[in-house]
Design a protein with these regions (language model features):
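Acidic, glycine-rich active-site loops and adjacent beta-strand->loop/helix elements
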Residues: 77-79, 140-148, 170-173, 212, ...
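Zn-dependent metallopeptidase/amidohydrolase metal-coordination segment
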Residues: 8-12, 336, 343-357, 364, ...
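Active-site-adjacent substrate-binding region
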Residues: 219, 226-228, 232-249, 394, ...
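A short beta-alpha structural unit
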Residues: 17-21, 263-265, 299-311, 349, ...
Length: 483
């Protein structure tokens, strides 16, 4: 056994140690499913496994708590598998090698899997600890959270009976989450033809770079500049007075990232060349002043190029540039339920020429309110459809609308105050969690999310703060005792 099994509370660390010895990559959860089923059988726990591989175990109430509502303890069983390049490790076969490093537990050159292994461990500990006082308990372990929320999407509708759900997949002790955003991606496809470039044109390449970028959920309220929108503004300006002809546009990559870089290749008539360059300098100066406080490293450059052979047909150019300028981007609405939380947003993620006849524009919408998510999706579709694009959407995933009046939240906050003499931070996140999908199948659920402190998740620097695990455990037990 590892040295971590001597840490307190030992019953939690012993379960975590056992979990680290079972390979559990996303989409390869067969062995951890077998581990969980064996655990249930060994401890005479009722259990059920659905078609996708999710496992739920049930423990009866302790004497005197039989009339309490059932509480679901939820965690995901898969882990992100990353290692340093100089480490020999097979995530399909090898156990995680844990070590204590000061006040932290980490792995030897790999991800630790405390996301969400420590949540699993706490749930298993509750199931076998006879000293814990609680009403009926269901422990739900989902598959493939990390790469597609597959377990939550495919959760059997007869798996759960509980009224309250405690998600154990949070990474900051002292915080209680009560909401998350749902999301949907939109892809607009412009069909185009290339035409022979006109004679007597001077061609340029404009580059926007060194923007901060960031996560399109967590960072969308920070005023980060979108590189695709910025390049489109220059093109729009040039089309008004200088007969600008577009040849190429490329910007952004990931659907869930605010784009940091973009460039375009275009031409203007030689007779307008000097005037256009002067206009560009004024335009660039205006942008630098506009972005000075929120994008201090913003860079825009214009370089003349050799003659280009082909340019975009005029109709597609008009539709593309005008829609990129006009499509909404950034924060659409703030939450009235949780002060400071973004409720609804959209991110113009990428613009790509694909093959010989398509331009593909990807936009990502988020909202903690399902109807608002649909509305912002409709806004985006309307702009691109009016511009002549074919528009399609992903299946999307639902949000978890914050309920500050939730009885479970009130009991969890009170429990935290009693235990630690301080107020927890009650928050919601403008990104996706499994909780929104649970609500879709079980709309009467009340939910909260909390956990110990993790840092460096999804990387070989992942580590779990030892001192926060007892606080996490104590809070969980107090919630179970008082709901």
């Amino acid at each position: 056994m590892s040295a971590i099994t001597n840490l307190e509370p030992r019953i939690v660390w012993e379960q975590f140690d056992a979990i680290t010895r079972v390979p559990r990559p996303s989409k390869k959860e067969g062995r951890i499913i077998e581990f969980l089923v064996d655990f249930a059988r060994k401890h005479n726990l009722e259990y059920k496994k659905d078609a996708i591989g999710n496992v739920v175990m049930r423990k009866p109430a302790t004497p005197g708590f039989e009339n309490r509502p059932t509480v679901i303890l939820q965690s995901h069983m898969d882990m992100v598998c990353e290692k340093n390049s100089d480490v020999e490790f097979d995530f399909d076969r090898d156990p995680i090698r844990t070590r204590i490093d000061g006040g932290w537990v980490r792995a030897e050159g790999t991800t630790l899997g405390a996301d969400c292994g420590i949540g699993m461990a706490a749930a298993l500990a509750v199931l076998i600890d006879p000293s814990v006082e609680h009403g009926p308990v269901e422990a739900l372990f989902t598959v493939d959270e990390e790469t597609g929320l597959t377990g939550a999407f495919e959760l059997g509708e007869d798996m759960l009976t509980g009224k309250y759900l405690v998600n154990l997949d949070l990474e900051d002790e002292g915080e209680i989450f009560i909401g998350c955003a749902g999301g949907i991606d939109t892809v607009a496809t412009f069909r185009y033809t290339m035409e022979e470039a006109p004679k007597n044109y001077a061609f340029f390449r404009v580059d926007v770079s060194d923007l901060q970028g960031g996560h399109s959920g967590d960072d969308i309220d920070k005023g980060r500049v979108n590189s695709n929108k910025t390049v489109a503004r220059l093109l729009w300006d040039g089309m008004q007075s200088y007969e600008l002809k577009l040849s190429w546009f490329d910007g952004g990559n990931l659907r869930n990232a605010i784009p940091r870089e973009a460039y375009a290749i275009f031409g203007v008539p030689v007779r307008f060349k000097d005037e256009f360059i002067k206009r560009y300098k004024l335009f660039a100066a205006d942008l630098e002043a506009e972005f000075r406080l929120r994008e201090p490293n913003f860079k825009i450059t214009l370089n003349e190029m050799p003659q280009v052979d082909r340019v975009l047909d005029a109709r597609t150019q008009f539709g593309l540039v005008y829609s990129l300028v006009g499509v909404p981007n950034g924060v659409i609405a703030m939450s009235f339920a949780v002060p400071g939380l973004v409720e609804t947003s959209t991110n113009l993620a990428s613009v790509k020429f694909v093959g010989d006849d398509r331009i593909v524009v990807t936009s990502s919408q988020r909202s903690s309110v399902e109807s608002a998510k649909t509305y912002v999706m409709q806004m985006v579709e309307s702009v691109f459809a009016l511009a002549g694009a074919d528009v399609a959407h992903s299946d999307g995933y639902p949000g978890w609308t914050p309920d500050p009046q939730s009885a479970l939240l009130a009991k969890t906050v009170d429990a935290y105050k009693r235990l630690f003499g301080a107020d927890p931070k009650v928050r919601a996140i403008h990104a996706g969690l499994e909780c929104g999908l649970f609500l879709e199948k079980y709309p009467e659920l009340e939910m909260v999310s909390f956990g110990p402190t993790l840092r460096g998740v999804h990387s070989p620097d992942e580590r779990l703060e030892i001192a926060t695990v007892p606080k996490f455990w104590d809070l969980l037990l107090e919630v179970l005792k008082t709901v």
